[in-house]
Regions:
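Acidic, low-complexity proline/glycine-rich segments
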Residues: 2-11, 26-37
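Disorder-to-helix initiation segments
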Residues: 11-28, 100-103, 107-110
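Alpha-helical initiation/capping and key positions within long helical/coiled-coil segments
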Residues: 24-27, 31, 57-60, 64, ...
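A structural signal for well-ordered alpha-helices, especially hydrophobic packing surfaces
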Residues: 25, 29, 36-39, 43, ...
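Helix-loop segments that flank and shape redox-cofactor active sites
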Residues: 35-60, 121-135
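Conserved alpha-helical segments that form or flank metal/cofactor-binding pockets of metalloenzymes
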Residues: 52-87
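Acidic/histidine-rich alpha-helical segments that form the ligand environment
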Residues: 93-146
């Protein structure tokens, strides 16, 4: 017996796979990937006072985001959607500062952008809840937002906001 956990896209009816859904899905994946890369680069490159605390904070954030990425892509694929993995080019930034405070601010920017993308995708799912797949994706987006919010609070506390 073979267990096929990936959805055969030819067998799935895809009324939700319209242009709006595609844009929101791909933006969520891209912003999540970019935020994960920025957190990992910050973890590797932080220097100076508060190094150890910031190093651990960035590690927690990229681990949290990595778990979110895995769940998001698996959820989207289970519903018959393949994210555009060509978007995984990274944020396209050069890091010119390595102090903890500046890197925390940079991570805050990326997490806020991610939170916005997740919120917009969640709203789309709520507005189209007649499709049970969107109810499931919406539930997943809501859980993602809670995790992202927790990381935002940690970064803001570190930054003294």
């Amino acid at each position: 017996m073979t267990l096929n956990i990936a959805t055969d896209h030819k067998q799935v009816r895809n009324p939700i796979m319209n242009e709006e859904f595609t844009v929101y899905s791909n933006k969520s994946v891209k912003y999540l990937n970019d935020a994960t890369i920025v957190a990992r680069l910050s973890h590797w490159n932080v220097r100076g006072p508060n190094f150890y605390e910031a190093h651990l904070l960035f590690e927690r954030i990229y681990n949290d985001l990595g778990e979110l990425m895995d769940g998001l892509v698996e959820t989207l694929r289970a519903c018959g959607f393949d994210p555009d993995f060509s978007l995984f080019t990274g944020p396209g930034i050069s890091m010119e500062f390595f102090d903890a405070q500046s890197l925390v601010e940079l991570n805050l920017d990326y997490l806020m952008a991610l939170n916005s993308a997740v919120g917009i995708f969640y709203k789309f799912c709520e507005e189209n809840s007649q499709d049970p797949r969107l109810v499931g994706i919406g539930s997943h987006m809501q859980a993602m937002a809670e995790s992202i919010l927790s990381d935002l609070y940690l970064l803001q506390a570190f930054a003294g906001h």
